A protein has these predicted regions:
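A generic structural motif
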Residues: 165-167
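Regulatory sensory and allosteric helical modules in signal-transduction proteins
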Residues: 79, 87, 91-137
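Intrinsically disordered, low-complexity terminal regulatory regions
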Residues: 2-96, 100, 179, 183-196
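Well-ordered alpha/beta subsegment
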Residues: 169-176, 190
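Sensory-domain boundary capping and coupling elements
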Residues: 150-163
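A short, aliphatic-rich beta-strand micro-motif
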Residues: 143-150
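Short hydrophobic/aromatic beta-strand element in the GNAT-like acyltransferase core
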Residues: 81, 146, 158
Length: 196
């Protein structure tokens, strides 16, 4: 019940001393992981060390990708989705992620994710609405970066990160994410091609 001096319709939980409201606001961060704040630079040295530790604890791809998507989502500011699509039966299938429910299947060669895995290259898209054939799983997404993840010399998955902010991913951030993917590739245990 609201007190007489409190404006009607206001939610006292919204008074978070200048904290940004949005998909990440108010959630607790895992132990040892600082919350990401808009405008803050990501410390990729620390992020890579944290990823290495998670992979040492459990390299099996389902558990590892679940924790890695949570790590990335918590560490990078201004995101609305961070997760993985796995190459399965000739198409990408959604894997572990953080954010709103996502498109389940993406054909190779379609959208940012399908194009990235089809070309086996990182795609850093400053304006997803200008990308031919963009697949909009979340209409709030404005920019996106997709990085292939390899296993046994083949592209086995993509790391997909979306932001509601246009031009979110700088060249410096792209380089940091590529370092993080190399850590993943060294520590992940994927099933053999065609296996589960």
């Amino acid at each position: 019940m609201k007190s007489a001096g409190e404006p009607q319709g206001a939610d006292p939980r919204d008074e978070r001393k200048g904290e940004a409201m949005g998909p990440k606001a108010g959630r607790e961060e895992p132990a040892g992981m600082p919350a990401a704040h808009p405008g803050e630079k990501t410390d990729y040295d620390t992020l890579c060390r944290q990823a290495e530790e998670l992979l040492k604890q459990e390299p099996w791809y389902v558990s590892a990708l679940s924790n890695l998507s949570a790590l990335i989502y918590a560490a990078l500011p201004d995101l609305n989705w961070a997760g993985f699509y796995l190459l399965r039966d000739g198409r990408l299938t959604v894997g572990p992620f953080q954010g709103k429910p996502a498109c389940i299947h993406i054909p190779v060669g379609r959208g940012v994710c399908g194009t990235a895995i089809g070309r086996d290259e990182t795609l850093n898209v400053p304006d997803v609405h200008a990308f031919p054939g963009h697949i909009a799983c979340d209409s709030a997404s404005a920019s996106e970066i997709v990085l292939p993840v390899h296993a046994d010399g083949r592209a086995a998955a993509v790391l997909d990160i979306d932001s509601p902010r246009p031009n979110r991913f700088s060249a410096e951030e792209e380089a940091g994410l590529k370092r993080l993917v190399r850590v993943m590739e060294a520590g992940l245990r994927f099933p053999p091609a065609g296996g589960e």
